[in-house]
């Protein structure tokens, strides 16, 4: 098995020069030959602002209040590909100023952001998350982002950073916000330290939305069935169904250009 990354450039267009695109590659030998998976990252499209994440007004307000806290641990949870890193990057970018030292330890560095001091995990030289976090503590950080809390050593270093007055962001692979507490306890973190340092958890998913440039009203929908289905949510003004069409200019006929974040927050 091999992992690697390739950087290339999009073709120039009449609107301007093509930007840089990064491709993340993973290969695996199988019974029928080499299998390859490629993930394409557009740095300009990936780094969003907090307002572009797609959360509702109430969730955005609670998140803004949470990240304004001076110290503690804030966790973002969800399955692989649910937008955890994008949320963290957008949040850190909103907090990074000339007076704020934002440091990250990642594996791998998903997107290069000049506003952060980013460090790559290197297991070959015995620098994992815990070792990298220990080194970051001597770099006078104000805000720290740990790519993922995978073991007790990393959790202990994150807790130590929070107890010494730092704001720490990290991710966990759990299905909901409450399970993040259970996950930390399973790693061996004492409950009193969890209560003293974890100030909030955001459980996140991605929901596809239709391309706003080409979607059209669906007049063939069974209104009675739709009203019955949407009754528990008490939507004001009723539900207006749309259907996918596809266009060349915005969604390249995929009909699903936009992906919107949904989240459930738990604060302490």
Over which residues does each language-model region extend?
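Cys/His-rich Zn2+-binding cysteine-cluster or related metal-binding knuckle/ribbon modules and their
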Residues: 174-268
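A generic structural signal for short, solvent-exposed coil/turn residues
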Residues: 15-17, 30, 42, 68, ...
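Active-site glycine-centered loops adjacent to acidic/histidine catalytic or metal-binding residues
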Residues: 78, 107, 263
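A generic structural signal for well-ordered coil/turn residues at beta-strand boundaries
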Residues: 2, 19, 24, 32-34, ...
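Active-site donor-binding loop signature of nucleotide-sugar glycosyltransferases
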Residues: 40, 52, 123, 204, ...
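N-terminal "pre-motor" subdomain/linker immediately upstream of P-loop NTPase catalytic cores
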Residues: 1-82, 87
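Switch/coupling sub-region of P-loop NTPases
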Residues: 64-67, 71-74, 85-208
